[in-house]
């Protein structure tokens, strides 16, 4: 009986750690996206177009590589 209780507590703690890790990852990704979009928002439309064009050329050249 006691061993089962200990095992259940360990399983609950492992599940808690897994859930907290997932939450931290989601929060970090969200903050990263917010930072990226706020940086993009500060650029002008022409700069965004130029960056998108350069990025597209870079990706195409990398794939042809």
Curated annotation (Swiss-Prot):
InterPro entries: SafA. It is a single-pass type II membrane protein. It is found in: Cell inner membrane. Residues 40-65 are periplasmic. Induction: By acid stress, via the EvgS/EvgA system. One of its GO terms (biological process) is response to acidic pH. The chain crosses the membrane at residues 19-39. Keywords: Cell inner membrane, Cell membrane, Membrane, Signal-anchor, Stress response, Transmembrane, Transmembrane helix. GO terms for cellular component: plasma membrane. Its main location: membrane. Residues 1-18 are cytoplasmic. Belongs to the SafA family. Connects the signal transduction between the two-component systems EvgS/EvgA and PhoQ/PhoP, by directly interacting with PhoQ and thus activating the PhoQ/PhoP system, in response to acid stress conditions. Interacts with PhoQ. This is Two-component-system connector protein SafA. The gene is safA.
